[in-house]
Amino acid sequence: MKSGSGPLPRLPGSRLQQRARKQLRDGGVIAYSTESCYGLGCRPLDARAIRRVLAIKARPNHKGLIVIAADFEQIRHLVKPLSAAQRAELARYWPGPYTFLLPASRRVPPALRGRHHKIAVRVTAHGEAAALCRRLGTALVSTSANRAGQQSLKTARACRMAFKDKVLTLPGRIGKRRKPSTIIDLESGRVLR
């Protein structure tokens, strides 16, 4: 997989990171900066927290959610084993703005995959989001910070105002992308978004 370059990411202070770690461990939701907007996230195997994300967004639970990670190792347990050719294909695109649909392992909660048998995963190239995943020691559910059908939120302040105490909002800067990630089904090669 490609390695990221550029300036070192700004990260929330260690106290705020400890609060974020506790929030996730306790089944809570955080808001954090990503490539194109703020995202809402939780631990990917915590079905209760995933349902909380869906409720905050008023998002239908059949759609499924994306998981981002700092590297493939953080998502390996979420997907069925991949062939060497499939891993090589992913390495061509990651880290980067490409989300792939991969066959989900049995461990993946239905609330995360929705009505699908695959899971949407991305190794992010956004320095702050990748560093956050590393520091928190987990991949993160990543869905735009907004209510379904509304504009994605672009600042920590907007998230704090919108979600109040339902979400722990971390300071950060969104990336320069204006569109959401491209979604590709790895098995068929079909571009879905």
From Swiss-Prot:
UniProt main location, coarse: cytoplasm
GO MF term set: ATP binding; double-stranded RNA binding; L-threonylcarbamoyladenylate synthase; tRNA binding
Sequence ranges assigned to domain YrdC-like in this UniProt record: 14-193
Keywords on record: ATP-binding, Cytoplasm, Nucleotide-binding, Nucleotidyltransferase, Transferase, tRNA processing
The enzyme's E.C. designation: 2.7.7.87
Keyword Ligase annotated: no
Coiled-coil ranges per UniProt: none
Primary role: Required for the formation of a threonylcarbamoyl group on adenosine at position 37 (t(6)A37) in tRNAs that read codons beginning with adenine. Catalyzes the conversion of L-threonine, HCO(3)(-)/CO(2) and ATP to give threonylcarbamoyl-AMP (TC-AMP) as the acyladenylate intermediate, with the release of diphosphate.
HAMAP family, sorted: TsaC
Name listed for the protein in its UniProt record: Threonylcarbamoyl-AMP synthase
Provenance organism: Chromobacterium violaceum (strain ATCC 12472 / DSM 30191 / JCM 1249 / CCUG 213 / NBRC 12614 / NCIMB 9131 / NCTC 9757 / MK)
